[in-house]
Amino acid sequence: ICECIALQITSHHTLYGPVILAIFVDDELFQKIDLKEGSHAYTITFSKREIMHVKIIQITELQYGYFELEDLQTDGEISKWDKPSNSILWIGDSLSAGYGLEADTTPLVFNTHYEDCTHAYPYMVSQLLNVLPIIVAYSGNGILSRWIPETEDKPNDEDILPSIFPYNISENPSWVIINLGTNDASFTRGIST
């Protein structure tokens, strides 16, 4: 039971926009926080003092920045949430990252403000199945090639699997779902071979 949570966070991001966190209270979006580069304090204030389930999720892609939680303090008690016993590892592109879901039209210049993985199928399906989602999604990624403009004829095979996989995963996922191939169409362009 608490009225506020104080976070000390270090954020590392690129020129494509800030790392964005979503704060959920009892599975409802409560607040979004655009993290500033470097180490900063953030306070989440609740209007009433009651038992609640709070989740803090990075909703932007790891390739555009990440955060480190240095400290967490509260005026109440914190107890660990029992995470689901099953998990799904989702490997995908912008569709899995939720890019473009925060805008009426797809923006011409990439910016992290236009993505939210909690509005994309990997997160939503995981919630419906009550499994832990592990989402590794990189906009522009493909199997044969990353996205390329129409003026290019050669595939862009830099930073495709396995080089983009961020770490040796400590989780042992129950299932793995790979949702890649959409960006390959920018290279294959309907070529039959």
Residue ranges and their predicted role:
Residues 1-91, 95-114:
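N-terminal secretory targeting modules
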